């Protein structure tokens, strides 16, 4: 396989790039790599904070349940805690998705710079990863993967937990309203969780479709 630059040419240019251009390109490459690291760190950090909050909240809910013998205090605390955790999950999901989209854009820009390297130094083809321009992101595992890929992202994981929290809150509310009916609680909880999960996954897929078709450069 061969890697092609922006001009789809592997031939040696008539002249070497100016030293200033080389400096600009390498600096931009380094900056983009740093930006990618920041997006990854932010996504994992936010997800860790969210999961920590969920873990602590559920432990507290369990203690309240034991202390109140699953009485009024348990339901009151649960109806406050679970929607709050679901909201935290929603904003974490949205920001993790934004970070993923930003990382995708940085990756495309880095691959553009790699095309510049191969254009002016084609002898590097035997030493650096060299694939056709249209296959670069797929080879790196960025994008693709079908519908299941959405569940493998940080945003997808947070979305699943958030949907479960929303369903749990709805089930708890249904149990209170229906006089502690298990059937009503299960039906309401499952329905809300499924609807929330489908909406979040569709929202994420739409965001990825938009960024995948967006043109960052005129000749794309």
Where in the sequence are the language-model features?
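Alpha-helical transmembrane segments of integral membrane proteins, especially early/N-terminal helices
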Residues: 10-14, 40-50
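Membrane-anchoring/interfacial helices and their immediately flanking loops
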Residues: 2-12, 79-120
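Alpha-helical transmembrane segments and their immediate juxtamembrane boundary regions
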Residues: 44-98, 146-206
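Cytosolic/matrix-facing juxtamembrane and C-terminal tails of multi-pass cellular membrane proteins
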Residues: 202-220
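Short, charged/polar, low-complexity loop and linker segments
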Residues: 12-29, 34, 92
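Solvent-exposed, non-transmembrane helices and loops of integral membrane proteins
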Residues: 13-23, 104-144, 217-220
């Amino acid at each position: 396989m061969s890697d092609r630059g922006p001009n789809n040419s592997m031939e040696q240019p008539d002249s070497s790039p100016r030293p200033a251009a080389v400096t600009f390109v390498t600096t931009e490459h380094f900056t983009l790599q740093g930006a990618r690291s920041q997006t990854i760190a932010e996504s994992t950090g936010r997800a860790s904070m969210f999961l920590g909050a969920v873990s602590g909240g559920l432990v507290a809910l369990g203690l309240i349940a034991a202390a109140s013998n699953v009485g009024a205090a348990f339901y009151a605390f649960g109806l406050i805690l679970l929607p709050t955790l679901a909201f935290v999950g929603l904003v974490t999901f949205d920001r993790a998705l934004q970070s993923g989209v930003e990382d995708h854009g940085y990756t495309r820009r880095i691959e553009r710079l790699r095309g510049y390297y191969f254009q002016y130094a084609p002898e590097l083809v035997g030493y650096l990863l060299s694939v056709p321009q249209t296959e670069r992101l797929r080879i790196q595992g960025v994008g693709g993967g079908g519908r299941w890929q959405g569940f493998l992202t940080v945003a997808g994981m947070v979305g699943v937990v958030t949907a479960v929290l929303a369903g749990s809150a709805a089930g708890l509310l249904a149990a209170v309203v229906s006089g502690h009916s298990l059937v009503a609680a299960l039906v309401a909880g499952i329905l809300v969780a499924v609807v929330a999960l489908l909406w979040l996954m569709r929202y994420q897929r739409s965001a990825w479709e938009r960024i995948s078709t967006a043109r960052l450069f005129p000749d794309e």
